[in-house]
């Protein structure tokens, strides 16, 4: 795989995790 492909896969994997963490922290604080 090229560096671009690795970066794309990491971004696709990380974005949902970050969104879930932000949503969870927002719900926990409310």
Swiss-Prot record:
Main location: membrane
UniProt GO BP: photosynthesis
Pfam families: PsaM (PF07465)
Coiled coil is among the record's keywords: no
Family in the record: Belongs to the PsaM family.
Keywords of the record: Membrane, Photosynthesis, Photosystem I, Thylakoid, Transmembrane, Transmembrane helix
Record's bilayer topology term: Single-pass membrane protein
Presence of the UniProt keyword Metal-binding in the record: no
Protein name: Photosystem I reaction center subunit XII
Compartments where found: Cellular thylakoid membrane
Organism expressing this protein natively: Synechococcus sp. (strain JA-3-3Ab)
Ranges that cross the membrane: 6-26
Alphabetized InterPro entries for the sequence: PSI_PsaM, PSI_PsaM_sf
A cellular component annotation (GO) from this entry: photosystem I
């Amino acid at each position: 795989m090229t560096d671009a492909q690795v970066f794309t896969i990491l971004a696709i994997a990380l974005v949902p995790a970050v969104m879930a963490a932000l949503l969870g922290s927002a719900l926990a604080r409310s």
